Amino acid sequence: MNLKVKQKIPLKIKRMGINGEGIGFYQKTLVFVPGALKGEDIYCQITSIRRNFVEAKLLKVNKKSKFRIVPSCTIYNECGGCQIMHLHYDKQLEFKTDLLHQALKKFAPAGYENYEIRPTIGMQEPKYYRAKLQFQTRKFKNQVKAGLYAQNSHYLVELKDCLVQDKETQVIANRLAELLTYHQIPITDERKVLGVRTIMVRRARKTGQVQIIIVTNRQLNLTQLVKELVKDFPEVVTVAVNTNTAKTSEIYGEKTEIIWGQESIQEGVLNYEFSLSPRAFYQLNPEQTEVLYSEAVKALDVDKEDHLIDAYCGVGTIGFAFAKKVKTLRGMDIIPEAIEDAKRNAKRMGFDNTHYEAGTAEEIIPRWYKEGYRADALIVDPPRTGLDDKLLDTILTYVPEKMVYISCNVSTLARDLVRLVEVYDLHYIQSVDMFPHTARTEAVVKLIKKV
């Protein structure tokens, strides 16, 4: 490799990578260029050299893709929260389908060349879709600003009118930053000041209820701030404080205390409502969640005699779509508050065939089997890290008749399929665009036990 940092080179972009970057070859060296699109001829500058590839900065597009558009966001290049807003939305959907093909080719689970990969299901209006806002805070010249860190940095980009963020959550976040400034609430920095680190605002689309978490690494007096905030926004029904003193990139600490209002908000999906406590996980895009869950119901295709396990169940939302269709439903999650929500939700909806426990799937499922419980169907919705090796071992040991894997990371999905297709036939993969203008996608995978 003869390339050097700061060297400027011409490049033909052959494809797009998992983070939305353009990928080309220069003298047989792989080059990654954020902002470049497939089919473009560009001029770029090398920014870093790795063992098997180099990274470069886009300087000029000599031949533009006909699908390149001008992003609507004025700080698109500065923020980094979205990666492919400069690509026409129809082509974004094609790109996300292609990501599945790329991941499968890399990990090569048995028979992947013949998998049915269905076109990605997109949104009618791909904007203002994020019902949950999670912004970092910093103080600049005595003014508190909230936003996201620029990519690969701790430089805060203030966001006051984000095009993918629910409008109401954005308005509340803007006002919260003003109140933090007015009341001179300490804001954490990179050196020695302790105070507010992060603000979270989540809005239930079905009910309009809002909950707020203020993440801090010291005890604060927020009484007057909260009083003014809830006066300005009557839809706020919960304000909580999460204490995180760890010097890590983890946003939340273990302790969350509600300092005003009720324990949870009410949200709805498909034909049922449920409670969400502040720390409980729920999908960020409510509109596409309806699509995702409908696809999961269709793929699992349960019957009334089935016993179903909902791993990574959260507050029970996916499982509730099946509760009236199966004989029994069991779920687990590592967040105890989510399990308590799941129990309350099931009771309120009148389900008497459900059972929930806090803990990991790889620990709980083997115990259930030892106790005599046998699942005919399994649904998994793991984090981006994919399935734990112990859980994979458990699945391969007990092999429920049918399984649906909901993935938010095509790479870990393809990796996990290498083992799963040892015992399952893969019927199809249906991707759903949960995060327009970003390089992320979700996929529903239908698996049936081999005969």
Swiss-Prot record:
Coiled coil start-end: none
Residue ranges occupied by any TRAM domain in the UniProt entry: 2-60
Keywords associated with the record: 4Fe-4S, Iron, Iron-sulfur, Metal-binding, Methyltransferase, S-adenosyl-L-methionine, Transferase
Residues that bind S-adenosyl-L-methionine: Q283, Y312, D333, D381
Active-site residues per Swiss-Prot or TrEMBL entry: C408 (nucleophile)
EC number: 2.1.1.-
MF-aspect GO terms: 4 iron, 4 sulfur cluster binding; metal ion binding; rRNA (uridine-C5-)-methyltransferase activity
A single GO BP: rRNA base methylation
Residues reported in the UniProt entry to bind [4Fe-4S] cluster: C73, C79, C82, C162
Domain of life: Bacteria
Protein family per UniProt: Belongs to the class I-like SAM-binding methyltransferase superfamily. RNA M5U methyltransferase family.
The name this protein goes by in its record: Uncharacterized RNA methyltransferase spr1717
Native organism taxonomy: Bacteria, Bacillati, Bacillota, Bacilli, Lactobacillales
